[in-house]
Regions:
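C-terminal cap of thioredoxin/glutaredoxin-like
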Residues: 2-10, 16-33, 99-104, 109, ...
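Structural alpha/beta surface segment adjacent to cysteine/selenocysteine redox centers
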Residues: 18-121
Length: 204
C-alpha cells in the first residue's frame, strides 16, 4: 500500500467520471499511489425506474443526440465503448455495493462493471437484479450482496462519502483530491500528471 492517496469523487451515472476513470488507470501506471473512490450524489432524487435525459436536461431530442455524439467522440479517443444514453438511473444502491466491494479489495473490478453496465449496455443499475448480475461478474458473493442491499449494510459508508463531498465543497464530478488540493473535471492525463508531480508523488 502506498503512502500516497488520491481521492476520486465520482458517480456511476456520470459520463465524465467514466472518461476520467480511464485516465486514472493511466496514472496508476505512472505513480505509486492508491486510489480511493468517494461516491458522489449526482442525481440522488432519480426515481427507481429512471428519468429520461429529455426530462433531466429539459431539452429536445436533437440536443440529446448531439450530447451523445460528442461523448462518443471523446470516449473513442480513450478507446472506451459508449452507447447512446436515453435515461439516467438512481445509483445509490450501486454505490453501496461499490463501497462494500472496495472494502474487500481496493482493486475490485466492480467500478468498471457498473460503468460498462450503464454506459455500454444501457442497464438500469438501480435495480437489484442488475446489481446482483454485476456482483457475479465481478467475482463477488451474490448472496452476501443481496443481504447488503436489503439490510442497507453500507448505507452509512455512502452517507459518509456524500457528507465528505459537502465538506470538501465538491459540486461536480469527477473531482480529484490530493493533500487537500483538488482538480475538477475529466482532466487530460497530462494535467493529472502535473498535479501529482507538483506534490512530489513517487513514480513507479
Amino acid at each position: 500500500m502506498s503512502s500516497h492517496k488520491l481521492e476520486v469523487f465520482t458517480d456511476y451515472v456520470c459520463p465524465w467520471c467514466y472518461l476520467g476513470d480511464s485516465r486514472v488507470k493511466k496514472l496508476k501506471k505512472i505513480f505509486n499511489i492508491d486510489i480511493q473512490i468517494i461516491h458522489f450524489p449526482l442525481h440522488p432524487d432519480t426515481p427507481k425506474e429512471g428519468k429520461s435525459l429529455l426530462d433531466l436536461f429539459v431539452t429536445n431530442q436533437e440536443d440529446i443526440d448531439n450530447k451523445n455524439q460528442n461523448m462518443k467522440n471523446l470516449m473513442s479517443n480513450e478507446n472506451l465503448p459508449y452507447s447512446n444514453r436515453t435515461h439516467t438511473f438512481n445509483s445509490r444502491l450501486a454505490q453501496e455495493i461499490g463501497s462494500w466491494a472496495q472494502s474487500l479489495d481496493n482493486k475490485t473490478p466492480i467500478h468498471d462493471n457498473f460503468f460498462e453496465a450503464y454506459f455500454v449496455k444501457g442497464l438500469n443499475i438501480g435495480l437489484e437484479s442488475v446489481i446482483l448480475e454485476i456482483v457475479a461478474k465481478s467475482g463477488l458473493d451474490e448472496n452476501e450482496a443481496y443481504d447488503i442491499i436489503n439490510n442497507r449494510t453500507f448505507k452509512s459508508s455512502v452517507d459518509k462519502d456524500w457528507e465528505k463531498s459537502r465538506t470538501y465543497g465538491v459540486t461536480g464530478v469527477p473531482t480529484y483530491v490530493y493533500n487537500n488540493h483538488s482538480v475538477v473535471g475529466a482532466q487530460p492525463i497530462e494535467n493529472l500528471v502535473d498535479f501529482l508531480n507538483h506534490f512530489g508523488v513517487t513514480k513507479l
